[in-house]
């Protein structure tokens, strides 16, 4: 399988971080201008937090199913 789970766990945060650096280089008022939801900068700050948290809880749920299925 080309996109395995360990590869995605590393690849998704790196892509999110690249998006964060891209918006930091494009936006003139990067830290202060990120408060509006219409700004691209807002979502580039939201993605690096949302995606790893989603992956963590997805893996946590999967581990819970794997552990408690055997009892």
UniProtKB/Swiss-Prot annotation:
Q: Which Pfam families match?
A: PIG-Y (PF15159)
Keyword vocabulary terms for this entry:
Endoplasmic reticulum, GPI-anchor biosynthesis, Membrane, Transmembrane, Transmembrane helix
Q: Where in the cell is it found?
A: Endoplasmic reticulum membrane
As for membrane topology, the entry says: Multi-pass membrane protein
What pathway is this protein a component of? Glycolipid biosynthesis; glycosylphosphatidylinositol-anchor biosynthesis
Q: Does the keyword Transmembrane helix apply?
A: yes
Residue ranges, Lumenal side: 27-44
Q: What does this protein do?
A: Part of the glycosylphosphatidylinositol-N-acetylglucosaminyltransferase (GPI-GnT) complex that catalyzes the transfer of N-acetylglucosamine from UDP-N-acetylglucosamine to phosphatidylinositol and participates in the first step of GPI biosynthesis. May act by regulating the catalytic subunit PIGA.
Q: What is this protein's name?
A: Phosphatidylinositol N-acetylglucosaminyltransferase subunit Y
Organism lineage: Eukaryota, Metazoa, Chordata, Craniata, Vertebrata
* Gene encoding the protein: PIGY
């Amino acid at each position: 399988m080309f996109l395995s789970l360990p590869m995605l766990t590393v690849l998704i945060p790196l892509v999110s971080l690249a998006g964060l650096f891209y918006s930091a280089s494009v936006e003139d008022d990067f830290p202060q201008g990120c408060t509006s939801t219409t700004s691209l900068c807002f979502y580039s700050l939201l993605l690096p937090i949302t995606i790893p948290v989603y992956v963590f809880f997805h893996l946590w749920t999967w581990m819970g199913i794997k552990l408690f299925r055997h009892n």
